[in-house]
């Protein structure tokens, strides 16, 4: 869900990509009732070439990642909460994962959004959210792409960067409830966790 992409370059900075999250025909989003607006900008993305392929990484110099603490482990019934993101509705999270099975990224409690990572697949299911347009989407991943994960979430937009920027998935995500905090649940080992709050 990204449209109207535009890039800018400056000799003193990386080439940046900006875009609108949402599609032109989707003007019935919940934000029209609560705030009188639809669609929003994605995070700026720094573009580079690696092996002839465009790589996109979040360009957020004002929101640097810092080491974060897991409370619990993903295999626990409640999963592993990211302590630094408790109560946050706008954040940045990065981690490395090795998979024995699926790992669910849970944003808030009972939010309706399902983000599931596996060694060769990403599943994003919006059917339980306040704006289920797009339904359930499955993306086949190249080997190793799911081992490095970075997620940006800002209230009604979620951006998932995999493989250190080789794959990017963007969706509008109007969640149920408060939609605060994040936990990791499932059969995966998670290391090198870092995070930053934007609220």
Model-assigned labels for residue ranges:
Residues 1-199:
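Beta-rich accessory regions
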């Amino acid at each position: 869900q990204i449209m109207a992409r535009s890039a800018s370059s400056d000799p003193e900075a990386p080439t940046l990509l900006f875009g609108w999250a949402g599609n032109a025909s989707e003007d019935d989003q919940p934000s029209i009732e609560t705030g009188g607006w639809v669609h929003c900008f994605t995070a700026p993305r720094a573009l580079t070439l690696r092996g002839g392929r465009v790589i996109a990484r979040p360009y957020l110099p004002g929101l640097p990642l810092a080491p974060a603490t897991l409370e619990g482990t993903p295999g626990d019934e409640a999963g592993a909460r990211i302590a630094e993101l408790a109560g946050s509705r706008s954040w940045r999270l990065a981690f490395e994962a090795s998979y024995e099975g699926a790992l669910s990224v849970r944003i808030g409690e009972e939010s309706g959004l399902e983000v599931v990572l596996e060694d060769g697949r990403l599943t994003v299911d919006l059917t339980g959210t306040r704006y289920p347009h797009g339904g359930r989407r499955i993306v086949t991943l190249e080997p190793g792409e799911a081992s490095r994960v970075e997620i940006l979430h800002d209230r009604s937009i979620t951006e998932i960067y995999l493989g250190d920027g080789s794959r990017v998935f963007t969706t509008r995500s109007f969640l149920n409830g408060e939609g605060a905090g994040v936990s990791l649940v499932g059969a995966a080992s998670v290391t090198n966790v870092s995070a930053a709050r934007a609220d």
